[in-house]
Amino acid sequence: MYNIFFHRASKFPGPTIAGATSFRYHWAMSTGNVAPWLREQHARYGEVVRIAPDMISYVSPDAWKDIYAYKPGEKEQNGIDWTIPSRDDDVPSMFSEPNDAEHNRVRRLFLPAFSDRALKQQEPLLSKYSDQLVHLIRRGIDDNRDQEFDAVKLYNFTTFDIMGDLTFGEPLGLLKNSSYSEWVQNLFRDIKTAGIFLFIFDFPPLPWLVKKFSPPSIQRAHEIHKQHTVDRVNRRLEKGLDRPDIWNLVLSQPEGRGLTHPQMHANADIFMIAGTETTATLLSGLTYLLLKNPEKLQRLVEEIRGSFGSIEELTVENLARLPYLSACLSEGLRCYPPVPIGPSRVTPKTGGQVLGERVPGRVRLTIPQCAAYYSDLNFKDPYSFIPERWLPGTGYESDRKGILQPFLIGPRNCIGQNLAYHEMRLILCKLLWHYDIELCPDKGNWLLDQKMYIFWEKRPLMVKFTKARK
């Protein structure tokens, strides 16, 4: 009763059960049904909804700055809420570092590795693995022209090999072996259980109990995974500074040596999650959406093949100039956000203000992209895949496009967003340059039928490739 009527956040609208206990939210999260549940709540209550006793959800574009941006002149900023625990003796990664000053210091060390200049140096590496993907498909259809491929696996193989090379100085060999390594399988397992860990970290005694009483097999798997990361990073560091990868650009700075080895291990681990699965997710979802909308696919193919005379012209710089490709990426990120439930923020003890309304202290604030991007408050025809909405003069000028922030905003936004865009453009365009793609028969809606545990649980997306008819 206290939470419903007298809690500091009780003035905000929302379902009574969610105001009474956070179990309703965590039940939706742990069962993979949080995306449709959040959409239903915002459709019923509007753009501000209380989804747990101390958690408020927003779908307004103006809420981004109020929640996530740095506010000059204010003594206290919104803080991070939950964190992804690092696997190296609880040493925080850049993502999970609670201290703003330390986060900013570490982030500044990594920024040169994700600059335009650095990404230009890394373009040959991106091309190398996107070409390996093209050749893997070619070998398959040369052996059997009716062979079906799982596009989800193909994209994961490619993004993990790219990020493995950038992070560890060596590929993981997924494209070469056409299979996941045990280390990558462990990453996917951890992603699926992330929703359960959110519940655990919401109740302070539980993390200690889980850690103390976890089965020995789980603890061993954790230690093996951690040691694998440590060994790979250490091998890379022993190679020196002769490679244009992340560690070269970090350690070549005098202050870059201020990172401890445990900090390097923790950040390498988070790079391998944030820089792989998310990019592959967008590519998988966009491929499905294009194949389900053949007229959109045809327009994109014509733009790619009609803009260049040879494969050598498909550079990240040239591809960034293609307007319909950019529109497709934006619409793909809207329809299928790789991080559908982003990290929330918590107001300082003195409280804060969102959308002109005072929010009490120690209240969690979030903008769930899986709900915001499907709200008819923000988009006309929100359940339709319409890349044209991102182009001028197409009748979608009233869309509140500022809500689309797939990489967040503010001092803790995604440091690797430019790398992600380069990967997405290069991988997708090389496939569409070389191949015509066809969706294999399937039941249901591959996209909307998915469960979501922090990230989407993707089932196989089976497709066929044939050599492009140019």
Swiss-Prot record:
Keywords: Heme, Iron, Metal-binding, Monooxygenase, Oxidoreductase. Pfam families: p450 (PF00067). Heme binds at C414. GO terms for biological process: fumonisin biosynthetic process. InterPro entries: Cyt_P450 (IPR001128), Cyt_P450_E_grp-I (IPR002401), Cyt_P450_sf (IPR036396), Cytochrome_P450_monoxygenase (IPR050121). GO terms for molecular function: heme binding; iron ion binding; monooxygenase activity; oxidoreductase activity, acting on paired donors, with incorporation or reduction of molecular oxygen. Its cofactor is heme. Gene3D superfamilies: Cytochrome P450. It is an enzyme of class 1 (oxidoreductase). Pathway: Mycotoxin biosynthesis. The keyword GTP-binding does not apply. It comes from the Eukaryota. Its EC number is 1.-.-.-. Cytochrome P450 monooxygenase; part of the gene cluster that mediates the biosynthesis of fumonisins B1 (FB1), B2 (FB2), B3 (FB3), and B4 (FB4), which are carcinogenic mycotoxins. The biosynthesis starts with the FUM1-catalyzed carbon chain assembly from one molecule of acetyl-CoA, eight molecules of malonyl-CoA, and two molecules of methionine (in S-adenosyl form). Belongs to the cytochrome P450 family. This is Cytochrome P450 monooxygenase FUM2. It comes from Gibberella moniliformis (strain M3125 / FGSC 7600). The lineage of its organism: Eukaryota, Fungi, Dikarya, Ascomycota, Pezizomycotina. The gene is FUM2.
